[in-house]
């Protein structure tokens, strides 16, 4: 499989059950014996037992093992302080939803409530990107956007070509407007981009040095593209699943790349974005011990993890 397990032991079970039905028992038994103890209780003994069961059947082809000639990849996390008006909006919304989210998490209708909780978390993430994603008539600025544009302009002056990823197509539209204002030539790829057009855009970007920036929505263009014409990657906002961002970075850091790839992850300081990074690190320790795949999905967060996201 070319699909990361993404820290979901249910996915691991389903793959084994397809290949060798019954080897990892029924899913109900597997969940009781392994998934709950490992994911929720971080039980080392259960983790080692599962690893022993699957190890003889797992051959991992990692980039580090087979692509020793690849150039370096330098990853830097760049923090930014929210603008005063932006911060006021963030703290006001956080204050309004805290109590409601705590109630929703404690109720039994988990599916419906979970959607409400994730929607609230999405609003916080959007405010970090640009309040205009949340408040349509917002006329103020976004410190992250200013930081992003500063990096982009300096990189272009130094001869770099950039892949710029965001989870939000509406954020890409805001960045697109700024690129036009600065007379920076760019391409954009989202879920609305047709397959034939994707191929043409990729070829043109890799071969035309006048096109300096490729705006890409994380879900639409995070996999399956060869964009070695770029040697810089900017992740405008963090996604729950670190593996998805790593795959997106690998659009540039892959066979055919001859330059060091510089990766910038933009993070709004003292916000939910910092908490998402912490979650990724915590989950990585667990998943490294199983299959060395980093990842967390928002739907898999525990009550404690969700509440921690809302801490100031």
Where are the regions that the model predicts?
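Conserved P-loop NTPase motor "coupling/switch" region that bridges the ATPase
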Residues: 1-64, 257
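Conserved nucleotide-binding/hydrolysis micro-motifs of P-loop NTPases
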Residues: 3-9, 21-24, 38, 84-87, ...
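SF2 helicase motor core recognition
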Residues: 8-9, 172-174, 214-235, 241-258
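Short glycine-/polar-rich loops that comprise or flank the Walker A/P-loop
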Residues: 10-14, 30, 73-75, 182-185, ...
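Conserved Helicase C-terminal RecA-like lobe
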Residues: 68-86, 91, 105-225, 296, ...
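Cytochrome P450 catalytic domain signature, combining two hallmark sequence patches
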Residues: 96-103
